[in-house]
């Protein structure tokens, strides 16, 4: 995410996507010229109106909270939509050498280990016009080494295989 208009404009000109975590950042990305379909919308502080607008217009929206799953029911049933979901991950278990000492689960997303992720995915799948398109896994690490990203990818593959998911991203 970046809230510097000149930087966003340059990134848009280069064909990059904007990653936003709030209404303000979403509006700024649109103001500098990003197409809605070139926005990735993450974070637990989404407002309902912007959340629905982003989904309706093809943005990559990653669901972070249970209330966002409920909001999917307000989408027009005559159209199909795609969303992603944020996985709550414990970096200390996945990549201990890259985690801060004593680090536990993230406070964002849905935990695979306790069944919360599968339950959330099942609720999304009850919305017949909404397809789960991807997983979002993010966690700040001490090292930002290739190893941490490799371990997160392995974890994502484990989830995909375990839950039998067919995803686009």
PLM regions and their residue ranges:
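Catalytic palm active-site di-aspartate
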Residues: 169
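Active-site-proximal beta-alpha core segment in soluble small-molecule metabolic enzymes
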Residues: 1-166
